Amino acid sequence: MTNEPWGRSATLGLGLIALFGGQGVALATLVGWYGLSMAHWSDLLVDGRLVTLSVYIATAVQTALLVLMTLRTGTGAASYLGLALPRVRDLILSALIVTIAGAAPDGASRLFGFNPVTQFQFDIYRSARTEGWLPWLWLAIVVVGPTGEETLFRGFLFRGWHRSPRDAWIAITVTASLWALSHAQYNLYLISQVFVLGLLLGWFRFKSGSTILTILLHGVLNLEAMLETFVAFNRA
């Protein structure tokens, strides 16, 4: 134990292990619980209940792995992952900026005749509502998911890649790119939007030193998306 962060290559490798480890355990658990056959694996992409459960399970496993990995450096997990409370001024200002940044592309999409609510969002919302899992889906999307993703991308990965103020934008860009690639269920336009928002979240992480701040901001973005889905569903 050296009290030094993992190297960049090790950080990337360990981060991927945590990410896919969590997803793998979630998949195996759901297959075991529900006896999903190969023919029904696609249900994991459209069934709101299964998506909700997978978020809970994957986040729990991924976070546990990240904590274990950080402890191997001899540094406390909270310190390593940037889990510090943000300043009130930073929270208010960044929340305002992120709210505008999240709403502007969706408004532009509607202006040009595109629906910002994807079929994936609509399908999981509809099925979760039908199965009585809607409150748990809201919690998964607005709270649990952002906590897991930010702990990985703006927490663990950012710490491993950010070594000095000079390489801040390298860390910000790398984490934003990886975060965007993790949203492969969306089209290229939305993935690009995720990347830009990732740059913004990374900047706030760098300036504030707080991953809790980016968790809250990520939650705001996902809340906007869920509200848009709610409106679209009730208009359908």
Question: Which positions does each model-derived feature cover?
Answer:
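N-terminal, membrane-interfacial amphipathic/helix-forming hydrophobic leader that caps
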Residues: M1-G82, V88, L223-A236
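Hydrophobic alpha-helical transmembrane segments
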Residues: S9-L14, T52-L53, L91-L96, P135-L139, ...
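Functionally important transmembrane alpha-helices
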Residues: G22-V31, W169-A184, L188-A236
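Juxtamembrane helix-loop-helix connectors linking adjacent transmembrane helices
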Residues: Y34-L53, T75-G145, R163, F233-A236
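Hydrophobic core segments of transmembrane alpha-helices in multi-pass, intramembrane catalytic enzymes
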Residues: A58-Q62, A140, Q193-L201
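Structural signal for membrane-spanning alpha-helices in multi-pass inner-membrane proteins
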Residues: L66-T70, P105-S109, I141, W179, ...
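Membrane-helix interface segments
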Residues: R87-L91, E131-P135, S164-I170, N187-L188, ...
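Membrane-interfacial alpha-helical segments at the cytosolic side of multi-pass membrane proteins
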Residues: R154-P165, L227-A232
